[in-house]
């Protein structure tokens, strides 16, 4: 797919790699050079409440950096066509700060993720990331607490109404 002799597929993969390289450097200004801020939307499953725009995506990664300041992404596999990039990556880091309210454990982690990225006119316009969040939480907080941490993480993503349903009237009462 990416190495079929056409410039556009390599360009799409290069745009994505450039974006990830900027994120690895914690340079969101440089990362913005690889996205179309007006059209960009991202769903980082488990970390954002569905699709968010570029400003909210930047805030989300800043929150992650507070908990995992040495966050680093490796991209061992990337496939691309004219406008889509699919990537399998590995993220590593150490929980030395608060991560979404959870305390620092000073434990490291290595977890896999998959990215689906759409590129238009040399800029990223959409990104969907699915990370192995359960593995991350277990490595950071241990088996039992990792599951609790994962539950708490997803709990905060639920809309307030879903977390506090209105009691139903008792029939015949």
Language-model segments: residues:
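C-terminal and inter-domain tail/linker signature
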Residues: 1-173
């Amino acid at each position: 797919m990416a190495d079929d002799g056409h410039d556009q597929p390599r360009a799409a993969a290069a745009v994505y790699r450039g974006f990830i390289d900027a994120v690895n450097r914690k340079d969101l200004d440089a990362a913005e050079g690889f996205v179309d801020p007006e059209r960009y939307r991202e769903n980082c499953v488990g970390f954002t409440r569905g699709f968010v725009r570029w400003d909210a995506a930047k805030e989300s990664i800043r929150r992650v950096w507070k908990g995992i300041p040495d966050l680093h992404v490796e991209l061992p596999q990337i496939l691309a066509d004219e406008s889509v990039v699919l990537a399998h990556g590995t993220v590593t880091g150490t929980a030395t700060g608060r991560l979404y309210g959870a305390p620092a454990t000073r434990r490291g982690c290595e977890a896999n993720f998959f990215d689906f990225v759409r590129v238009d006119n040399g800029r990223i316009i959409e990104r969907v990331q699915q990370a192995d969040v359960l593995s991350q939480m277990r490595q950071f907080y241990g088996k039992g607490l990792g599951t609790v941490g994962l539950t708490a993480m997803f709990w905060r993503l639920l809309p307030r109404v879903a977390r506090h349903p209105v009691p139903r009237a008792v029939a015949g009462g």
